[in-house]
Regions:
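ATP/NTP phosphate-donor binding region
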Residues: 1-72, 254, 270
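Short, acidic/small-residue loops that bind anionic groups at enzyme active sites
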Residues: 95-122, 131-137, 255-266
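Short acidic, glycine-rich surface-loop motifs adjacent to enzyme active sites
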Residues: 77-89, 226-239
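Internal gly/pro-rich beta-alpha loop/helix module
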Residues: 109-179
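Short Gly/Thr/Asp-enriched flexible loops that form oxyanion-binding sites at enzyme active sites
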Residues: 83-105, 242-251, 280
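C-terminal non-catalytic interaction/assembly regions of soluble proteins
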Residues: 237-331
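Short acidic, glycine/serine/threonine-rich loops at helix termini
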Residues: 16-20, 93-94, 119-122, 152-158, ...
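Accessory alpha-helical/coil subdomains and C-terminal extensions
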Residues: 2, 7-11, 28-29, 34-39, ...
């Protein structure tokens, strides 16, 4: 029988109503397991309550805590299941994909849209299936299990705020799906995985700027004292209003000339960006320090930058790390 470690972090799955009328995490890891007694027939389980937070409050410090716990327990367990809130689960899944690379053991995130104590909750289904995937043959790496889907950590996005079908795999096949109680794998553990690598250093000095028509360019210098990298969510396949002659281009050139980075992505959910297509993007793509996110998810773009910036102060090396595919984040 395989041995799995449950890491409980809070979220809706672990929430109870408060006196003020809202929901807040309060249910423990032991209580979660008690709600799914059939897990005892599936595998041996230990549980750790890392923290109990609404996932809106989960960020780099909590990602580091999760990684430390997995690294310290990696040799003792066959896999890991993380109970997590849904709102930032895709960020955590992407972050763990960069901070725990080449893992032959599964690191599975799951949660729910309703508390595990809610009568019509999706929590028990999701938690049980997360463990089913974790003990399955061929399971590996950072995955997100939700509503009968298994999604690679770098490809997961929350696409619905209320429905049980809350997460989608963006521009990449699902790792596996469940049909009733049967797990149907589409992707299996690569045969030539290098040894697992753990990283803990992150630099969160990344700002994401969503362009809107009419936006003033003077916002960019206001960010310079506080951030090393700027992610620009641009229109379509990418570009700047006014192109090479615009005020935004001039400010971005000053940003890059100061040694900072800028990464272009798109506001469109699918198919990525390509600055070479239109004149409003071609000159931008030639600026030193400008990168393209290609088909990466917005969550992966932001946290990969945090990870790369945490490894080095050298801009060229940060650019190399960002452009190197990790866990199929770039196709």
């Amino acid at each position: 029988m395989k041995k799995i470690l449950l890491l409980a972090t809070g979220g809706t799955i672990a929430s109870r109503p408060t006196a003020a009328g809202g929901l807040a995490p309060a249910i423990t890891s032991e209580e979660l397991l008690a709600c799914v007694p059939e897990l005892a027939d599936l595998c041996a389980i230990d549980a750790v309550q890392l923290f109990n937070l609404d996932s809106t409050n989960v960020g780099p410090a909590q990602w580091q805590e999760i990684v430390r716990s997995i690294r310290e327990n990696y040799a003792a367990y066959d896999g890991f299941v993380i109970a997590h809130g849904t709102d930032t689960m895709a960020y955590t899944a992407a972050a763990l994909s960069y901070m725990i690379q080449n893992s032959a053991k599964p690191v599975v995130l799951t949660g729910s849209q309703k508390s595990i104590y809610n009568r019509d909750t999706d929590a028990r289904n999701n938690l049980y299936r997360a463990f089913v995937y974790a003990v399955s043959e061929g399971a590996w790496g950072v995955q997100l299990v939700f509503d009968n889907k298994v999604i690679l950590g770098t490809r997961a996005r929350k696409t619905r705020t209320r429905s049980f079908d809350a997460f989608s795999s963006i521009d990449y096949p699902e790792t596996a799906v469940f049909r009733d109680t049967r797990l149907i794998p589409f992707l299996r553990r690569p045969a030539d995985l290098p040894p697992v690598q753990f990283y803990e250093q992150l630099d969160p000095a990344v700002f994401v700027l969503r362009l809107v028509p009419g936006m003033r360019a003077d916002i960019i210098p206001l960010l310079a004292p506080h951030y090393r990298a700027l992610v620009l969510e641009s229109f379509g396949v990418g570009g700047l209003p006014g192109g090479e002659q615009g005020e935004m281009f001039a400010e971005l050139r000053r940003w890059c000339d100061s040694g900072r980075l800028a990464v272009f992505t798109t506001q469109v959910p699918h198919e990525g960006c390509d600055l070479a297509v239109y004149e409003v993007g071609r000159a931008v793509g030639e600026l030193p320090g400008v990168l393209e996110a290609h088909d990466m998810t917005p969550e992966a773009v932001a946290v990969k930058l945090m990870w790369a910036l945490g490894q080095t102060q050298n801009r060229a090396e940060v650019m190399r790390l960002f452009e190197t595919p990790v866990e199929v984040d770039i196709i």
